[in-house]
């Protein structure tokens, strides 16, 4: 067999393989594409109100981001077993993992509400550095507080929705969560326009209207997903007896906690690390906060493909591992990683070429638009490397190597990325764009680590 044929056999699948992969991934990609598109429109509408409003909302969204990742970690702790339970035909085990998700997400929501109600103002202030002396940071703080109080009302429906939606996806049914998301983001977009600007009989509420629109949309999405799941019990066998009791067998709970707690802590610590990096950037002034907000919103539109392709790796590989088909798991993983990176290179190239047009949509200063354009270009250059490390992370997670993923993700962030950001932002005279590039470039170290870990096959484990 020629060298090219060996490479093709190892890293490229046939039509049936990609059809199966894309049937799972495309609904998730579309769901997140619509969500991020509406987030982009929401960001633009808030941006029309002014730099202070946009910055206040952006900072609060950084805090909510940590909560979102905590919820993701809570459901992921059980999902590493859920996919394998389903692949093994163990519906009762799948039900216990669902219960764990409900308990964990509601606990995280309660703790988050308590923290942000008592310390929200202090946390927002950490991101506000007045380098000009015009009082803009005080105005941004007030807008941030207005936005935060209302956003807290949407935490519980988000938590419940994630518990249900992730279990539904583990069964391979990605269409319903996608449709629910479409309805929710449509609701969000319409209400954003009506409530932010006061169209027709609706009051002009500004940032308060943006928060209300988001909260209402979250309730809509949760109701649709929960209603469908209970109306279609035959497709969601894990719901059989889910509410007849509240217990989880000690042995299963212990297993989930041992494997899952590192994953939960990983998501929280990684998200906290990323917000800390943003805080380091923010010491360079409110313009940097605004520019980063624009760039991050645009980047989120383009990184959807590699993020969702990576997430699908844990589902497909997890099902193979649960069924004991270890060689198929390794083969599928190789092909999915290559496909994910290939798709990301295309998206990154498009983002690099057209990303600079987006900042002009915002109602802000030329300086902020210029910063945003440069941040977008840097993000596009680094994105393919992020794709590989992201796929590596989900590969390791599919085999239950949560302690390894903990070291790979959050420990790396706090030991490498955060110190680099802090030292460059506080201790050098480098421009903020140079600082941003050097911090983002630390992803190359992570790529090397991820490659070695995946190649070692430590993740090829049947856990159920």
Residue ranges and their predicted role:
Residues 33, 37-55, 124-138, 194-205, ...:
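Helix-terminus/linker motif at the lipid-water interface of multi-pass membrane proteins
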Residues 51-62, 144, 148, 211, ...:
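Small-residue hotspots at the loop-to-helix junctions and early N-terminal turns
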Residues 29, 33, 37, 41, ...:
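Generic alpha-helical transmembrane segments of integral inner-membrane proteins
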